[in-house]
Amino acid sequence: MKSTIFFALFLVCAFTISYLPSATAQFVLDTDDDPLQNGGTYYMLPVMRGKGGGIEVDSTGKEICPLTVVQSPNELDKGIGLVFTSPLHALFIAERYPLSIKFGSFAVITLCAGMPTEWAIVEREGLQAVKLAARDTVDGWFNIERVSREYNDYKLVFCPQQAEDNKCEDIGIQIDDDGIRRLVLSKNKPLVVQFQKFRSSTA
């Protein structure tokens, strides 16, 4: 029993140490050139204009509640604010920090009250899609990686816990038969984004 506890503690420490901030750690910057706050809320907006707007949720397939993470078809729509949180005890988020992502508050029908808001990867029918789900999820975490040193352009990646060589996959867009722009794992076709501070419309 003691050996099992010791091994578990060893894994936690090893994971934490591997992500400790270093002198070369690069903070993820928003559109104001400010570093993203750990636990802060931001809009995630596409760099390429004319191909959709911010990130929101929708119902796909036989879903009654909006459980599929999608890109708004309206390029003027900023979508829903996203909360980015790292388990590391850091004030700001740096590139490649392990992250959980969830939606801030948004209105749903009464039937869907209490539905999950945290992002997860769900694999069904050969497609690994970003969903709001508590079951049938792939264990792992999200990262933010920079794609341009000249601009504050980034991509999201997902790193499966069981992946060989810590291989992570890009988050991209797949347009389904209904024209819905779904966020999915995509090989070498990332959705390139920028992060804008969330400001409530009632503020």
Curated annotation (Swiss-Prot):
GO molecular function, one term: serine-type endopeptidase inhibitor activity
Role played: Has probably no trypsin inhibitor activity. KTi3 is responsible for most of the Kunitz trypsin inhibitor activity and protein found in soybean seeds.
Disulfide bonds: C65-C112, C159-C168
The species this protein was found in: Glycine max (Soybean)
Name of this protein: Kunitz-type trypsin inhibitor KTI1
Signal peptide: 1-25
InterPro entries, per the entry: Kunitz_inhibitor_STI-like_sf, Prot_inh_Kunz-lg
Record keywords: Disulfide bond, Protease inhibitor, Serine protease inhibitor, Signal
Lineage, top ranks: Eukaryota, Viridiplantae, Streptophyta, Embryophyta, Tracheophyta
Presence of keyword Signal: yes
Pfam family, one: Kunitz_legume
Superkingdom, taxonomy of origin: Eukaryota
Expression across tissues: Seed, and at low levels in leaf, root, and stem.
Family: Belongs to the protease inhibitor I3 (leguminous Kunitz-type inhibitor) family.
